[in-house]
Every structure is written in structure tokens, then in C-alpha cells.
Amino acid sequence: KGSVVALVSAALRAAGIRHATTPKPHLVSYRERVQIDGQPLAPLPFAQAVARALDAADQIEERVGPATEFEILVGAIFEALRQEKITTAIVEVGLGGRLDATHAWDGGVAVVTNVGLDHQQYLGDTIEAIAKEKGVTHITNAPMLRGRMVSVKGVPVDKVEASPEAAWALRG
């Protein structure tokens, strides 16, 4: 995922397109998790975005339960992107699938880099189940790009596509 974010960011930078990335993990500061044109968000805008995300989490906690650290961070990132008027962002998902906090972002296109037996307690315990879950990462009828996939234990590669409504998939 990180390599795809870096590659797309480099292409956007070369084209002169202002954009944000949400790389992970951070090495020194949470601010590294939201970068605009390759630079971490400044401390004050980041702190303001976190404060707004915490306020929003408090407002809905009674209905949906407490937010996780990742959900609050994603909320802060999306708020920062809104405040900075970012129209192009490369958002790296967490665990992937419909339960991932980044799924709230309507990015218009999704990239599934690979499907493996990870986050099984949330995504399923088979490659097929995980592929279907990760396939819902994107918006229906929006483009979905995917890296080279190989059949594992007889599961067809096309199981990574969420539904017949997916507009197209680029096979690498």
C-alpha cells in the first residue's frame, strides 16, 4: 500500500497537482499521517483537526460506542483535508473493507494491492471472504485498480472484484 501511495504521489507532484497523502505508519509524529505535497501538516491545523474529530466522536459515542484511536485519526485527517481544501488525496486504508474508517472517504477510485490472510477477525478467515470484503472498499460503479493477483488455494482471482457493478479492473 505504501509503495502505491508513494508512486501516485510522485506522479501527481511531477504533474504539479496539489495533493495529500495519508502514509503510515508515522515514525516520529502523528502529523506525518497527513501530508500535503510531501510535507506533514503544520502543528496548529493538525491540532485543530484532532480537536474537531474528538468533538465529533464525543457527539456520537452514545449511539455507536467509543471511537478507536484509528477512527479519531482518520476523522482528523479528513477534517484537515477539508480545511486545507484538498481535492486530490491518496488515502491509505487500515485493515480494508467496509468496516475500515477510511471507507467513509469517497475517493472515486480504489486500488487493491493484494489479498492475503490478514485481519481475519474482521475480514473473514478465507482468501475468498477477505477478497470480497476488500472489494467493497471502493464506491460502486467507480474504477477499481488492482495489482497482480494469484489464485490461492483454488480461489479465482476475480473474487477480488466486489460486484458486477464494478466499472473495470486493471490487471497488472
Give the location of each predicted region:
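Internal gly/pro-rich beta-alpha loop/helix module
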Residues: 108-109, 122-138, 143-146, 159, ...
